[in-house]
Amino acid sequence: MRHTIYTLTLMACWLAIVECQAQQIVNRKYDNVTLSEALLQLNNEQTEYVVNFLYNELEDFRVTATIKNKRLPDAIQQMIGFYPVRMTVKPDDREIYVECTHKTDRHLTGTIIDEQGQPVAYANIAVLNPSDSTLLGGGVSNESGYFAIPYEQAKVLARISYVGYKTVYRLCDKAEVGTIRMQPDNYTLKGVTVKGQRLLYTSTDRGLQVSIQGTPLEQFGSANEMLTHLPLMMSNGEIAGHGKPEIYINNKKVRGEDELERLRADEVKSVEIITQPGTEYDAAVSSVIRIKTVRRTGEGWSGNFSGAYRQGHEHYESVNAALNYRLRNGMDFFARGYLTDNNTQTVKTTDEQLQASSIWNHRKEEEYKYHMKYYFADLGWNWEINDHHSIGFTYTANNYIGDRKYICANDMQTMQDGMMWDEGHSTTTTLTKPKLNHSINAYYIGEIGKWKVDFSADYYNAHSQNEMSGGTEGETPVSSSTATKNQLIAEKLVITAPVPIGKLTFGEEASTVDRTSDFTQSGFSADNHIRQQTAIWSVFANYSLKVGSLSVNAGLRWQNEHNRYELDGVRNDEMSPNYHVLIPRLSISYQHSPWTHSLSYQCTRNNPPYSILSSAVTYTSKYEYNSGNPFLQPQTNHRVAWKSQWKWIYAEAIYGYQENVYHSIRSAYDDVNHPGAILTDFRTVPKTQYYMIVLNATPKIGIWQMNYSVEFAVQDHDYGELGIAHNWHGLMTDFTFDNTFTLPHAWMLNVTGSITPYQKSAYWINKTTGSLDLRLSKQFLRDKSLNVALVASDILRTKYDEGTAYGGIGYRNIFRLYRDARRIGFNVSWRFNATKSRYKGSHAGQSERNRL
């Protein structure tokens, strides 16, 4: 027995030695040596690969790096860094090829240092034509401040820039530039001189570019939480002045917040906030957030695990896990899972008045409870074949665990003309039965010659079964059932074509939707069977041109929509309109550091959600019913905006004009058979307009990073055609104060406050409301891969919705509502061997998915 154990031990040691020899590990430190010398040394010291390169071609590129426990391809990739150098690995032949991507005889070289003589890493060097400042090439300095950039002209203009430092221009007539010293760019804030530091964001011709890596933003646990602390983000999750954004992660459309919860903030390199999206986005999109993750090399297993818990009146908890296995040839296999137990409570008091044949008053104390257990899982594969081609595929499934439960309970007193008419307790329970939903996404992104192709296709299939039961105590119970089936097929193609001047992008997008809804009830209204079919096909083109400091972007989208609406098996032509519309977008930008200005026009078009196009009347309580309106038309929005930015100060003025705006409205349901009952449905307002100013400031003083945003808006709505007499034009304001303190030993404190002062606008009056949130976090382990955070929201319990609304015909409502916002909890997340996802697919037909 001992002999057997001894033999097995020797065999294990021998196999380990063989494995280590087969996959030799590189541990080495380089200090300002040429890339050619480093490659030659690595080639001579190992036998796993043969490294092929041209010595003279790479001699100008110098390496300063510390390599620890890396295989040879990963070590070479780290040495290459941001240089215009490409590495090709041929594992079958055990060969590595390293070559410069720009075949020129000249390399512009130099070293960048700061005011204290320390090297400046990752500074941007742009090589310009001295005659017209057109961009000829560019690069980034390495860890020792050294840069080497291929160029061809005899004389060039070098522009060296780094956030927080003054930009340096150097006219170069020889390859060796020498040492360039950069000076901080200082500014004064209330008498305090603040020396140049990295700005939280920079301006682009489409919006803002926010750096996440290396800033306090990377210490927020999840990407979802991190996004709430970006510039221009308001407490309601919208971009100030631009509504709810569409979100992409590495070109893949985000389907829900659970995807953002699974992505760690420290895996994000940068975020682009697009407030002027082109026509390649859907006609309904008014703003976009594009997340770019940190690209890491490596093979084998990687993953992350996280959990969250919140406790208020009800509790919330979630866990998620992601695993990825990467092969040497760039192929990834991944699986993700997410599980949540979400419970919420809303309490509300209302005093409703309805003027019909009599004056009815309903005084209610209401409680809404929501209980849901849910899982999300997907399996996928993607293959980055080479630098020019990548493909991928993802299957996603999600479902409820048990019934999703929504309970509405209220105590109501009803008075007619000042006299007591009725009182009682009412309870309704709506159960959503578990139904497995499926979706499939596939994509191809590639370059064919000078043409770039981005293609994606989607299939989505979802069923739901809702069952409502309840009523008022002592009276006949009511019940209803709604069975819904949704199916979507969509595809999208975007092509970037080579043109002599500027950039041309064009493509097409198509989607088909088949939706059925079967509604049955116990006698309080009428049964119906509705089938809605929609086919949308669009073509679009964008052209952009940059001349010096001036940029012009123009785009046009032609959208064709065909609808078929069937009620109880019979087509209704009036409810089946066809549309053929043009969606134009235009922006002109001027950038001259530190100023950026832009003028833009944007047209968007929003189709009503399918759920409000139903004519079914559903039951809420004895005196409350709900319905939709199948005659609603798409809403068209026109927006003109002027934006200016100076360093960390942002300002924007917006004018908006809207057509066919759909609103919910309340009126008498049936004054004869249901006296005093209120019906909520949807109507169209022909036109509205609004004026808005958005301000944002993101200064940094030492450890204190500020991010303050404010909205000022005035609305000019005319609801007279709906029978609503009130039309106020009061100022609406919204303030967000986000403060992040970076503390020693990987601690971070965030204090965020928001306040919405008293508002009197359109047909409502809202009282002042606000909240105060805290987050204290710490990163653990040597690589800071473990993050633990204590979080508290709405500490002062001030986030009430309170006011008076006249949103109906002869209708008034005085209300006070609280959504269980005060909670305390914690987040824990851990990642290992983080080889970031290469999945690049986006989603076609996304607006139709949102409507479903």
Model-derived features: positions:
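Short, acidic Ser/Thr/Gly-rich low-complexity loop/linker segments typical of extracellular
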Residues: 131-146
